[in-house]
């Protein structure tokens, strides 16, 4: 068996960074760059009733998070080839669903379709590949990484002329530019939303922020089944749905949560996060982007990882395992970091 050539990690990282910068920017202004990007995938793929669709995969499993333009009164179905997997409702109205497919063939493209309870198509079929088996020897693996794609709609009219966050249309174009390089997977490294509930500067330190007052959350209540549910969707939805749409339907995504995903800035005193904001973070994940699928070498009993009829999904610990070529461990520590003399980032069970 031929040996793989030795790869110097420093040279690899330096070369990768240079190639990424040249490929993405080439010295061009942002507006000129985005104007050259191809027609959005959603314009050549019939999304039907689908508002947004984000998948993740392992070698034998697929997990989808999907929202629809209207509530569905009965559970839709995900068809993977000739097999069917029922949807599970993630909200209380029937607009947000998840689909979990198991025991799939590894390393092959699968034909997927979403159908309503009456058998009608909810969108055009598409393909999504599972990862190669752990003993496979793939020749290449390309990973797209980015961070801080959230934020309410802003305005951009040219270099030095940005107000607030970038418009969601430009964020979407940048991500589609990344997708044009054909990544095998994508890591969204936190800050998918910016809607901090407290102020952490000046005389208002610790007081409710203007955005918190706008949302008018009931901090003593549950997220789902109350006005809190609608307030969450009004705050988070416009920061996620138009940025991703269904453009990542054929690219597995891995979403880590950072400080702003817990509806707070990581200023001193803000963490460990308050119970209600922790529930908001969990609910946002439940609605919009997939948790991490099981992996045989991941220890059981990690924080925010559970055994259920969906297997050992984790909200905070993930693995990208691409044959024997790439293994990427993903750890989210925002929920376990503490302050004080005995402060830690990782829960003792993780240590």
Where are the regions that the model predicts?
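N-terminal secretory signal peptides and thylakoid transit peptides that target proteins
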Residues: 2-20
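Signal peptide processing junction and immediate N-terminal pro/mature segment
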Residues: 28-38
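Metal-dependent phosphoester/phosphodiester hydrolase catalytic core
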Residues: 9, 14, 37-351
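Sec-dependent, cleavable N-terminal signal peptides
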Residues: 18, 23-24, 29
């Amino acid at each position: 068996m031929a040996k793989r050539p030795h790869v110097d990690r420093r040279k690899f990282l330096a070369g990768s960074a240079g190639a990424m910068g040249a490929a993405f920017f080439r010295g061009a202004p942002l507006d000129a760059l985005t104007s050259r990007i191809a027609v959005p995938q959603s314009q050549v793929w019939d999304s039907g009733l689908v508002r947004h669709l984000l998948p993740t995969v392992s070698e034998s499993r697929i997990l989808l998070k999907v929202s629809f333009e209207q509530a569905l009164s009965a559970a839709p179905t995900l068809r993977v080839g000739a097999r069917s997997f029922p949807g599970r409702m993630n909200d209380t109205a029937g607009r947000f669903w998840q689909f979990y497919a198991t025991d799939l063939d590894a390393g092959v493209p699968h034909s997927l379709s979403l159908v309503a309870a009456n058998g009608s198509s909810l969108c055009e079929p598409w393909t999504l590949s599972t990862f190669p088996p752990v003993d496979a020897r793939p020749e290449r693996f390309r990973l797209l990484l980015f961070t801080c794609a959230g934020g309410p709609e802003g305005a951009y009219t040219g270099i030095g002329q940005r107000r607030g966050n970038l418009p969601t249309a430009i964020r979407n174009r940048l991500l589609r530019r990344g997708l044009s390089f054909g990544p095998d997977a994508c890591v969204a490294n936190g800050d998918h939303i910016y809607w901090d509930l407290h102020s952490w500067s000046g005389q208002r330190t610790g007081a409710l922020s203007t955005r918190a007052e706008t949302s008018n959350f009931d901090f003593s209540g549950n997220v789902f089944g109350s006005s809190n549910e609608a307030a969450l969707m009004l705050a988070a939805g416009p920061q996620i749905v138009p940025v991703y749409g269904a453009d990542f339907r054929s690219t597995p995504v891995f979403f880590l949560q950072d400080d702003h995903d817990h509806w707070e800035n990581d200023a001193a005193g803000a963490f460990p996060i308050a119970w209600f904001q922790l529930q908001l973070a969990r609910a946002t994940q439940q609605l919009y982007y997939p948790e991490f699928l099981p992996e045989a070498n991941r220890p059981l009993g990690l924080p925010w990882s559970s055994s259920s009829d969906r297997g050992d999904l984790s909200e905070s610990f993930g693995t990208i395992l691409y044959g024997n070529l790439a293994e990427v461990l993903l750890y989210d520590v925002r929920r376990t970091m503490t302050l004080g003399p005995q402060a830690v980032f990782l829960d003792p069970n993780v240590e």
